[in-house]
Swiss-Prot record:
One of its GO terms (biological process) is rRNA processing. Residues 228-247, 544-557 have a biased composition (Basic and acidic residues). The modification Phosphoserine is found at residues 425, 509, 658. It comes from the Eukaryota. This is Ribosomal biogenesis protein LAS1L. Belongs to the LAS1 family. Signal peptide: none annotated. Residues 185-227, 558-602, 611-646 have a biased composition (Acidic residues). Residues 185-247, 501-646, 733-759 are annotated as: Disordered. Required for the synthesis of the 60S ribosomal subunit and maturation of the 28S rRNA. Functions as a component of the Five Friends of Methylated CHTOP (5FMC) complex; the 5FMC complex is recruited to ZNF148 by methylated CHTOP, leading to desumoylation of ZNF148 and subsequent transactivation of ZNF148 target genes. Required for the efficient pre-rRNA processing at both ends of internal transcribed spacer 2 (ITS2). It is found in: Nucleus, Nucleolus; Nucleus, Nucleoplasm; Cytoplasm. Its EC number is 3.1.-.-. It is an enzyme of class 3 (hydrolase).
Length: 776
């Protein structure tokens, strides 16, 4: 045992040499005790930045001591680093399993390294000496020799080992007892009895207790089972361990839940207003996060212990003081008492589960913890436990009321969105939207939920089955659902009396149900007033004080329902108005498109008529020019001027029309001729009127975009020479004469021949070229 502790402290020893006071001095790598305490607190907090700072300090310690660093410090640093990498989400599942596995294997190997050098004991026994459970050793064995375990198993082992290290090493340092309890001489430990060693472990309150069976217990077991073999004796001896472990975890879970309630009520006392406290509750504090992580580790090891603690009075089942602190008035919820009417004990049969839900403040109180623990396995186990608890309690009181409410709340909260959720009532739908416990619903095993509900029949089983059928959807056919409902209603028709009879007749029936005889039939046919007068009087007294409270709550609920209905109607009206506006806009757009298409078709027809008329007129003019003589040149010039004007008008109309119906599918000959060339008409819907002349859509300021891709060079000597370019005086005089032709008729007539010789095109041809030229 001493070698194990010395291994953790990273020290060596000599067996036959007594240590002097001066030799007990230890060289440490931290500067002061304050630095050690700071690193201890930072390692086990929930702030990742502080944990990283603590890891950096341990790295500095390792650089100072090297291999002499205490093994507990090194193992803690490795495990905390694995947790930080896991929380960062930068690695995959396989890489995380390798990291966790390496850290856990090193932990188990290091605690047993010094001990295995001196003795050949199995690793399981060495781990039991320091209160490490067998499943940690088995996990190390699987990581080393067998198939890699699941990532959740690795995380569970990491959390447990960190908790073990915190208790057995770091807490001892903070208490200042490391030197007295861990550094014991080998001779002193050999002289001590096992009983004294147990007393020291119990007195420390740091190590997890694993009680060993006493001699008296062993004698009793041997007296009871004289003929049992050694294996049987081992099994009998191991039976008390799980029960004691379960009890220990149960007590620890209760302590954590009490701490959680204290933290939540502190927030409520600080803010006083419930709405502000609910907002703060949703933001988990570091202390609440620590409680949540510890509950997760306990749940991974023993889920039943956590469920038992949750369903104790004072937690999910509130006390009257807790309800008063949360400003919740207790309402039985099983009966609806009206004025002047007598409440019957069996009136809970008419309960409507559509309105049975957990009060919102109480639901928000436990929401952070339930959301953190939420998973398919945990939530389903909690539901099954509530079904079994509901079958054992009565039908009145605060415990059955809140078990039923939590059951309905869990079923509604785990319903997926869609048709299944729409089957719920308005209050349940609002509960799922605003009161739901979880951000995302877990896929529950609904057939298993039905089996649990039918396996624990109670007075509310038919109504609970209906809620389950609504939540799960079409998992079972409607006919099967109806059959199950009928069987359940027949089985639970005796109600409360049948439950009492079943409890009384449990001794005569192995299944816990009393046989149905003629006596029970006569008792059922008797009026309820003969047997239940005392019960009715008690219930009337209990419920007499709650009548006014219930009526006020009913009024408030009715007002809230009216407000909710008005809000829903307003939302529906707004949605209808939006839909109508969208439909009107679509109709207007459709009409505008039709009008534009009609206008485009009309413009096409007009354009084609104009083109045909222009072609016919141009043909007529050419024929007239061929027939006329030279004497009628002046008339021809006049006709040419008229043709030029017409062409200008046609070109102008063409420019206007092209901007309107560029996007239409025209089949004119002009477009067919241009199809495939660089001057073809674009089919894209581009509003050319918004672009200046010479500008293209998407064109930048870089002039290099307008350069040609392919071009040929032509030398100056190869260019054709035109004779009239060598006569600049004639061309100048001809242009001047054209400009001044209207003022002097003699000069125009004398220079007409010179004009025709110097110009390549006349004025009419120039106008035609301009009209036919299209940019882009």
């Amino acid at each position: 045992m001493d070698r194990v502790w010395r291994a953790w402290d990273g020290q060596s020893f000599k067996e036959n040499q007594p240590e002097s006071p001066s030799a007990r001095g230890i060289v440490v790598s931290w500067l002061s005790r304050a630095e050690w305490e700071q690193v201890t607190v930072y390692l086990f907090c929930d702030d990742h930045k502080l944990q990283q700072y603590a890891l950096n300090r341990i790295t500095v310690w390792r650089s100072r001591l090297g291999n002499e660093l205490p093994l507990a410090v090194a193992s803690t640093a490795d495990l905390v680093r694995c947790k930080l990498i896991d929380a960062a989400g930068t690695l995959g599942t396989d890489e995380l399993r390798l990291l966790y596995g390496m850290a856990l294997v090193r932990f188990v190997n290091l605690i047993s390294e010094r001990k295995t050098k001196c003795s050949n004991l199995p690793l399981k026994y060495l781990a039991q000496e320091v209160n490490i459970p067998d499943w940690i050793v088995e996990l190390r064995h699987n990581l080393t020799h067998k198939k890699m375990p699941h990532i959740n198993e690795c995380r569970r082992g990491c959390y447990f080992v960190l908790n073990w290290l915190q208790k057995t090493y770091w807490s001892r340092q903070l208490e200042g007892s490391l030197k007295e309890t861990w550094e014991l001489d080998e001779d002193q430990l050999d002289a001590e009895d096992p009983e004294e060693e147990e007393r020291e472990i119990i007195a420390d309150d740091v190590l997890e207790e694993i009680p060993e069976p006493q001699d008296d217990d062993k004698d009793e077991e041997l007296a009871v089972e004289d003929d049992a073999n050694t294996k049987g004796n081992e099994e009998v001896a191991s039976h008390p361990e799980p029960s004691s472990r379960h009890k220990e975890l149960y007590e620890k879970a209760r302590e954590l839940l009490v701490s959680y309630e204290e933290e939540q009520f502190k927030v409520l006392e600080k803010h006083r207003h419930l709405l502000q406290a609910i907002k703060v509750w949703n933001n988990l504090s570091p202390r609440v996060q620590c409680i949540l992580e510890e509950l997760k580790s306990i749940s991974w090891e023993n889920r039943d212990a956590v469920l038992d603690a949750f369903l104790d009075d004072g937690f999910l089942i509130p006390t009257f003081e807790q309800l008063a602190a949360l400003q919740i008035e207790y309402e039985d919820g099983q009966t609806e008492v009206q004025k002047g009417e007598v409440t019957e004990p069996n009136s809970h049969k008419n309960i409507d589960l559509n309105e049975v839900l957990v009060p919102k403040p109480f639901s928000q109180f436990w929401q952070p913890l339930l959301r953190g623990l939420h998973s398919q396995t945990f939530t389903q186990a909690l539901l099954e436990r509530m079904f079994s608890e509901l079958s054992t309690v009565g039908s009145t009181g605060i415990r059955p009321t809140y078990i039923l409410r939590w059951t309905v709340e869990l079923i509604v909260a785990n319903t997926k969105t869609g048709r299944n959720a729409r089957r719920f009532s308005a209050s349940q739908w609002e509960a799922r939207k605003s009161w739901r416990l979880f951000n995302c619903s877990a896929t529950l095993d609904w057939p298993q939920v039905i089996e649990s509900c039918l396996g624990s029949p109670c007075w509310a089983s038919p109504q609970l089955l209906q809620v389950v059928f609504k939540a799960m959807g079409q998992v079972l056919p409607d006919e099967e659902q109806e059959k199950l409902l009928r069987v359940c209603s027949i089985y639970t028709q005796n109600g409360e009396n049948g439950l009492a009879k079943a409890i009384e007749g449990s001794s005569s029936s192995s299944t816990g149900k009393a046989p149905y005889t003629l006596d029970t039939l006569h008792e059922d046919l008797q009026p309820p007033g003969t047997n239940c007068e005392s019960e009715e009087s008690i219930q009337q007294k209990e419920q007499g004080n709650l009548k006014d409270v219930k009526q006020e709550e009913k009024k408030e609920n009715e007002e809230e329902e009216k407000e909710e209905e008005e809000m829903e109607e307003e939302e529906e009206e707004e949605e209808e108005e939006k839909e109508e506006e969208e439909e009107e806009q679509e109709q207007e757009e459709h009409q505008e498109e039709e009008q534009e298409e009609e206008e485009e078709e009309e413009n096409q027809k007009v354009f084609q008529d104009q083109m045909e008329a222009d072609v016919e007129e141009s043909d007529d003019v050419e024929e007239e020019e061929e027939v006329d003589d030279e004497e009628e040149d002046e008339d021809d010039d006049y006709d040419d001027d008229e043709e030029e004007d017409r062409m200008e008008v046609g070109a102008f109309s063409l420019a206007q029309g092209s901007s309107v119906f560029e996007n239409t599918r025209t089949t004119s000959r002009k477009r067919e001729a241009l199809q495939g060339s660089a001057w073809q008409v674009s089919s894209e819907d581009v509003r050319w009127g918004t672009f200046p002349l010479g500008r293209l859509p998407g064109q930048t300021e870089d002039p290099a975009e307008l350069m040609l891709d392919n071009y040929d060079t032509m030398y100056l000597l190869d260019q054709p020479v035109i004779e009239h370019r060598l006569e600049p005086q004639k061309s100048k005089s001809s242009t001047l004469s054209l400009c001044c032709g209207g003022s002097n008729t003699n000069s125009s007539s004398s220079s007409s021949s010179g004009n025709m010789e110097g110009l390549l095109w006349n004025q009419g041809q120039m106008h035609g070229l301009k009209a036919g030229l299209q940019l882009f």
